[in-house]
Amino acid sequence: MKNTLYERLQALPITDLAPVFDNGARGRTMSASSCNWLLSKVCEAGVKTIIDLRTADHTDKFCKKVHDAGLAYRHIAIDSKNTDVREIIASLPDFFAWLDEGDFYMACAMGLHRTDIAISIYYVFHPSVPYDSVPELRGHRKQGSLRCDDIARRLNSIMNALTPEDLIRLGLPDGYRDEFNRRKKHLFAINSIF
């Protein structure tokens, strides 16, 4: 399916811009003061929500700039190992809803690494994402191969920490580990071909 939001954003000078499924985009955080005009253009292009994945470098200043540009601001700390896994799990229902709404721009400091992890979490743990809707991972490619250790570490940490109550909250069945392994394997297999 065509991602018209991504197509409209391609006209703008956004570093590391990439599509997210058929309803969003991702790239670098536009937090520098020189990017204020760009946030307004992103809004004009149809983005309604900025999803900030930064952890320690997250600031309220960027939140204000986003609101001043007429956009909604959402934050979830995502990384490969430092953010507490329970914090991430608690945020997943909201995070999945933000992506389901569409018209979002997901951002991290460098544009691709944390967003790779985030869209992998969405693909592997959100029950409404079809098995064949594998996201393209762009930030973890190095010298002709996919470097999946950071992504696998975070996916495994979430799976290992899920309680029966978490599974219910996320709409996942008991015994989800088999489907988790199937999706994780498929994610890495598809992305190893580029």
Give names to the regions the model predicted.
Residues 1-106, 110, 117-194:
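Cys-dependent protein tyrosine phosphatase-like superfamily
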